[in-house]
From Swiss-Prot:
Name this polypeptide is given: Exo beta-1,2-glucooligosaccharide sophorohydrolase (non-reducing end)
Database matches in Pfam families: Glycoamylase
Main location: periplasm
Reported pH dependence: Optimum pH is 6.0.
Organism: Parabacteroides distasonis (strain ATCC 8503 / DSM 20701 / CIP 104284 / JCM 5825 / NCTC 11152)
Length: 721
């Protein structure tokens, strides 16, 4: 027997010491994808058998305790054979604070009457592939009537587990199932709501019925929204839908941090009616809300662009950390932590949202007063901000570990690309907008870009500086990648700027160290000099490592910096970026890896969430595993408008049932392995809104490029012969 206490991590990062409202450790609630469930495993040895698809458990779409689906476990346990199945914990980036559990809880439903002894045995698998002891499920399922959901609660101490808490809970990797009595018969059971719960859960004497605010229809989906209630009392909201206004069926749940539901109907001209209830941890349900309804309708390309821009904008407006008004790293994820680079992108998305009428200018002004006030008080490191900040305190969060506890110059540059854009937008002569400009000017002039050279004669800028460990990370900034804007803003800095020559000595360096750096991460010699000159898929690429890299390289630095208007010794960057986008699409059309879905309307390899971690995909076989992020093609609209529009239509009309959500398209998907990310990412939602707006009106480009310091900096670089 193995005890979880033995797995306690001794050294905790500073981020785990923060105070944040805890949440539940959930192995399964619902699958976004039909077919097989990615975070599961199923295998057998004949004559036993377990139903599976590609060694995963099937998703049961028509049977569910928590709508809309459950997992199907159909098996034969025969003498001389064996089977095994597990339901894995799906890691959510930033979910690190959990209610201390005491039980493994689930809902179980038998399809038919069965021999209770043939129920599976159950254990918990550790991350190191060892197991707790197996228990007989029949000892905890007291009621075996078929066709009814039965709650099952197994004390963790029965598995030999004790002292489970935030320091070790992620060592619990999966719920494992093996045969009980081998009687040779076929049985089916359904499993739902598999989670670890504490002994004492929040409850209330009476739940208030939610108050619905709107139902808004689009081409193939309807959004409903309600007034949020106290999150402490509610486990989830349950959404009911009717097509006749009389008979309602539960179709989904939403955890209390989300007060919206996107119902993807997949049809045009479909009317639906909705009600919502609140459900507490004892599964008590409130009265119904009032009814709202809407009807889907055909949309033009321009209307689809509006729809996508607004949904992605919503991430930064409704999904923002409330005290700072800035962007979270991802949703779901760490509630109190803001990501500074994503916030800079979101600032530009909010400006676009004002111009598009998603919010009023006055609403935008109030948000920016909050943002600038927060940033003025937040931790700074020679004027630079950290990558992650606690939105409730303004203190640095060392989310990537104890070395990441100081200034992050790249994230600072992403933030200030947005702030300078906003500074130019809020140009009215009233007290509030004057205050916004004054605050941004003060923040801007106090960034000590030159400090991040590390030493006086350094040809490079450095990514990080720690107040107690100095240059411990010691990462030089060398292009080609996402950091062009860092060098550009450092040259533009009004008080602590760097020499414009550092554009060539640092960013575009041709020193041996820089050559080795590029060849190492690109795993090719192409582009190691910064310049390239090779032709890929019919496009001659003047600058770039390998055949261009992930597409965020042509997005992040150019949300405000207009690549049409920047030409250095080697290339014009609109033309060069456009070639990279075309190379990426043509690689996906050719599809050497044979990945499901790739083509002229499914392309755009870039950095995104993946099943177990964050990865950067690019158009090279060794950097491509079939994972596609919608932001890749959609943030490339200025470069490839026709190809990007094809991708938008495809993602929405053909894959919207799992890919489209409350904040636009989910971060990534992989049709080859039937996986979709549960996340919306702060770094990936805004570039879609911003670059579509730049394609349509040049708005953000015009604003950023109008700043006097930006104009001076570009002139300095372009004057170098």
């Amino acid at each position: 027997m193995k005890h979880i206490a033995l797995l306690t991590t001794l050294l905790l990062s500073a981020s785990l010491q923060a105070v944040e409202k805890p949440y539940d450790y959930v192995f399964f609630e619902n699958s976004l994808m039909k077919g097989d469930y990615f975070y599961s495993q199923a295998k057998y040895t004949s004559p036993s058998w377990i139903k599976n698809a590609r060694h995963h458990l099937p998703v049961a779409g028509s049977v569910a305790f928590t709508p809309g689906n459950s997992l199907e476990l159909t098996y034969v346990s025969a003498p001389g054979g064996d089977w095994y199945s597990e339901i894995q914990y799906c890691p959510v980036r930033g979910n690190d604070f959990f209610r201390e559990p005491s039980t493994l809880s689930m809902q179980v439903r038998l399809r038919e009457s069965m021999n209770a002894a043939a129920l599976p045995n159950i254990a918990i698998r550790y991350a190191d592939s060892t197991y707790t002891q197996y228990l007989n499920l029949r000892n905890y399922l007291k009621d075996t009537r078929p066709g009814v959901w039965h709650p099952v609660s197994i004390p963790l101490e029965d598995f030999g587990l004790n002292a489970v808490n935030d320091t070790n809970i992620k060592k619990l990797a999966a719920v494992a199932l093996r045969p009980g009595t081998a009687d040779g018969n076929e049985y089916t059971i359904y499993l739902d709501d598999i989670e670890l719960l504490p002994a004492s859960l929040p409850s209330v004497s009476a739940l208030n019925a939610p108050v619905l605010q709107e139902a808004k229809a689009y081409e193939r989906h309807i959004d409903i929204k309600w007034i949020p209630q106290s999150k402490e009392d509610i486990k989830y909201y349950r959404i009911y839908r009717s097509f006749d206004g009389i008979t309602y069926q539960p179709v989904a749940v939403r955890r209390p941090w989300m007060n919206r539901y996107t119902d993807f109907l997949g049809e045009v001209g479909k009317k639906a009616y909705y009600k919502v209830t609140a459900v507490d941890y004892a599964l008590n349900e409130s009265n119904d809300s009032q009814t709202v309804s809407a009807t889907t309708y055909p949309m033009t390309d321009e209307q689809l662009l509006d729809m996508v821009q607004e949904a992605n904008f919503r991430y930064y407006w409704e999904g923002a950390e409330p005290n700072s008004g800035l962007a979270r790293e991802n949703i779901p994820g760490r509630n109190d932590m803001i990501a500074t680079g994503a916030s800079g992108f979101g600032i530009m998305a909010i400006v676009a949202g004002i111009e598009r009428g998603f919010i009023t200018r006055e609403e935008g002004v109030q948000r920016f007063l909050k943002i600038t006030s927060f940033l003025e008080k937040a931790d700074k490191f020679h004027g630079a901000v950290s990558h992650f900040i606690d939105g409730t305190t303004g203190k640095t969060v060392a989310f990537f570990g104890p070395k990441d506890n100081g200034g992050d110059l790249v994230e600072t540059s992403f933030l200030f690309q947005g702030l300078l854009t906003a500074r130019q937008y809020f140009n009215q002569e009233n007290d509030k907008e004057k205050q916004i400009r004054k605050s941004i000017d003060n923040l801007w002039k106090n960034v000590e870009w030159s400090w991040y050279k590390q030493f006086k004669d350094s040809p490079y800028l450095y990514w990080h500086w720690s107040p107690d460990q100095a240059w411990v990370i010691n990462h030089k900034l060398i292009g080609w990648n996402e950091t062009m804007i860092t060098y550009m803003l450092a040259i533009m800095g009004p008080k602590y700027g760097i020499s414009p020559e550092m554009y060539y000595s640092g960013w575009a360096s041709q020193e041996e160290y820089a050559q080795e750096y590029r060849a190492d991460w690109g795993r090719v010699e192409d582009g190691k000099m910064y310049t390239n000159g090779n032709t890929y898929y019919g496009e001659n690429l003047k600058v770039g490592v390998s055949n261009g890299g992930p597409l965020f390289f042509i997005h992040y630095s150019y949300l405000g910096l207009d690549p049409h208007k920047f030409t250095d010794k080697y290339t014009n960057y609109f033309e060069n970026n456009q070639k990279m986008a075309k190379i990426n699409q043509r690689y996906c059309i050719e599809n050497q890896g044979g990945y499901v879905g790739y083509g002229e309307d499914c392309w755009g390899l870039t950095a995104s969430d993946f099943a177990w971690n964050y990865q950067a995909q690019e158009p090279m076989p060794h950097r491509d595993n079939g994972t596609m992020a919608p932001t890749g093609a959609l943030a490339s609209f200025p470069y490839t408008p026709d190809a990007s529009m094809k991708a938008l239509r495809n993602y929405y009309r053909n894959h919207g049932s799992f890919l489209w959500g409350e904040y636009g398209f989910r971060d990534a998907f992989n049709l080859t392995v039937n996986w979709v990310s549960p996340l919306f990412m702060g770094l990936n939602q805004a570039p879609v809104t911003v670059m579509i707006e730049n394609y349509r009106t040049n708005l953000l480009w015009n604003l950023f490029m109008s700043h006097p310091d930006v104009q001076k900096g570009i002139q300095k670089i372009q004057s170098i012969k």
